[in-house]
Amino acid sequence: MLNVGCGRRYDRRWVNLDLASRDASVVQYDINKGIPFADGSFDAVYHSHVLEHLKPDQGERLLQECFRVLAPGGVLRIVVPDLETIARLYLQKHQQAWSGDEDAAVDYNWMKMELLDQLVRDQSGGRMGPYMASSAIQNSDFVRQRVGDEFSLCQATPEIETVRKPSLMLRFRAITRSFRERWARRCVRWLLGTKKAAALREGLFRGQGEIHRWMYDRYSLRHLCQEYGFEKFNVCTAFESRIEDYVQYQLDADQEAIRKPDSLFIECVKPISAVITKATPRTEPAENELLSAKVA
């Protein structure tokens, strides 16, 4: 079983892939280069909150690769933010706020951020991060219902933060990258002015993988999966799966708490009759297309 773009949520009984490895059980690899395993290697492939961070054509290539490395009859499980639910809640809160409901007006502001912020932000955390970290948040229960673990992490103090620190090598790379980018901005500012330097900073940020480049609902995701050969598409919950004993791995939920309640959970199957073929070779992606492990 393969977990693609696992981030900090993985099980050592799976094969785990991520752009940045913080553990020996995570293989460091850029999935924009494909998936580095032979055809038909896995009975299940899973990726959660990865697809929306890719451009549409990159997402299509990822699905092709998932199809390739799955054995016939294998299960693909995808988790993404649910555009349909976000849109419905946005319209519901909009109507209630328009009618004078002050509580709904607060929720409306959040739903507008949830819909747009990760698409348009130009700095880490955007508007959502500071909002969730605020001690004066008015609709904490609603926001917690929407984003789950992310809200708890934003509310946590440094003293109780339990997320594992990056390795020394990752920290060194981050410092080196920051140094290079800082000098690049200074050079651009000197040569082209402040506005061009600001454009460079924004471009560098948006290429790091935090932003969302596309959104999906059950209809568009079903169409996409069927286009690339999958069948038996179904929408499920965090606790339902064709993957044997899936719940025990706690990838989508801990006990009864769903990690990302704003998610759409789907599964589809590679047909038993599928003929395994090699994916079409392609050129190396530009550095700013690399998928970051940092997802929100």
Model regions: which residues?
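Short intrinsically disordered terminal tails
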Residues: 294-296
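S-adenosyl-L-methionine-dependent methyltransferase catalytic module, highlighting the catalytic core
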Residues: 58-61, 65, 75-282, 287-291
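Conserved SAM-binding loop
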Residues: 1-86, 219, 266-272
